[in-house]
């Protein structure tokens, strides 16, 4: 039996302006080379652009987009015998949000456009409406899990 204790789960901090944990999670994922102030600038510009586009509360659009992209189930490669199977596993809420944010940022980076704030705001608005690359990625993951449902007992 291991002598090591289990690590305490860290709670996500809130960002200074909106006091929102999701915004802070986004900032930490968009961060590159330790330039956190630039990451904050990009996110705050994104929020302003969402406000201009939708004329509703931008944080509710962000919440709705992340809720729409968050997967319930995913597949994990598991080696059984000589072959590797894609085994469907359930995903917790924290891990699901992290995946959703990663997918949203990946989809927005692939988009054509002027700058990251513009691309991310477009992707978030699309995801809130139920379209976009991030939503497609979620649906594809769910399809994969459904197709490999027969291997669920390998968990």
UniProtKB/Swiss-Prot annotation:
Keyword Protein transport among UniProt keywords: no
Naming one, the record's GO cellular component terms include: small ribosomal subunit
InterPro entries membership: Ribosomal_uS7, Ribosomal_uS7_bac/org-type, Ribosomal_uS7_CS, Ribosomal_uS7_dom, Ribosomal_uS7_dom_sf
Q: Which keywords label this protein?
A: Chloroplast, Plastid, Ribonucleoprotein, Ribosomal protein, RNA-binding, rRNA-binding
Cysteine pairs bridged by disulfides in the record: none
Which Gene Ontology MF annotations are present? rRNA binding; structural constituent of ribosome
The superkingdom of the source organism is Eukaryota
Q: What NCBIfam families does this protein map onto?
A: rpsG_bact
Instruction: Outline what the protein does.
Output: One of the primary rRNA binding proteins, it binds directly to 16S rRNA where it nucleates assembly of the head domain of the 30S subunit.
Query: In its UniProt entry, what is this protein called?
Result: Small ribosomal subunit protein uS7cz/uS7cy
Annotated organism of origin? Dioscorea elephantipes
